[in-house]
Regions:
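Membrane-helix interface and helix-disruption motif detector
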Residues: 1-10, 57-74, 90-96, 112-127
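N-terminal signal-anchor/start-transfer transmembrane helix
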Residues: 6-32
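Alpha-helical membrane-associated segments of multi-pass integral membrane proteins
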Residues: 13, 97-148
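Cytosolic, membrane-interface loops and tails of multi-pass inner-membrane proteins
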Residues: 27-41, 148-157
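Membrane-helix boundary elements
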Residues: 32-69
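Cytoplasmic-side transmembrane-helix entry/capping segments in multi-pass membrane proteins
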Residues: 39-45, 94-103
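Hydrophobic, membrane-inserted alpha-helices
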Residues: 51-61, 78-85, 102-114
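Short, highly charged, low-complexity non-transmembrane loops/tails of multi-pass membrane proteins
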Residues: 140-165
């Protein structure tokens, strides 16, 4: 079982990276629906952040079963803090809006990957960084609902795809 957990820990960042390259800013129908739902509905953003946190808990469980150290406890505390939607929304939207903060998060994740006992922190920073890329920008979220309701579905999708960066 430990070998399986080690394989999951090793493969998980590559799966996230492949998802990023295969799905970000693509015009597939399911991605158009995803972008529209994330922009228009708060519950979709809540569900997205909850799914990210559940994946992080699973990866931290894998880290805890293979290497038990204090970094796992620190990463679990960071994840528990993000279970408040306000905190997770703030973190994801700030990482989306501030490119320097996003770059710093990715640099911290790469540094923690290089240090042997900080692998669980790598997974937290890396996953939250990748998840913030798929989060809608503050510019899109500030558009009033009435303006969205005045447009037809095709115009909404085109505008969201154009401004989803």
């Amino acid at each position: 079982m430990l070998q399986t957990l080690d394989i999951i820990k090793f493969v998980f960042p590559f799966v996230e990276l492949c998802m990023f390259f295969c799905l970000y800013r693509k015009t597939y129908n399911f991605m158009k629906r995803f972008y529209c739902n994330m922009t228009l509905f708060r519950n979709a953003r809540k569900f997205y952040s909850l799914c990210v946190l559940i994946v992080l808990f699973f990866i931290n469980w894998c880290c805890c079963m293979t290497d038990q150290n204090y970094a796992v406890g620190l990463s679990v505390m960071m994840i528990v803090l993000c279970f408040s939607y306000r905190v997770s929304d703030y973190v994801l939207s700030r990482l989306k809006a501030n490119k320097v903060l996003f770059f710093a998060t990715m640099v911290i994740s790469m540094i923690s990957f290089a240090i042997p006992y900080l692998n669980s922190l790598f997974h937290v920073f890396y996953t939250i960084g990748i998840a913030s890329v798929f989060y809608p920008s503050a510019r899109l979220l500030k558009i009033p609902k009435e303006e969205w309701m005045a447009m037809d579905k095709q115009m909404i999708q085109e505008r969201i795809l154009k401004e989803y960066n």
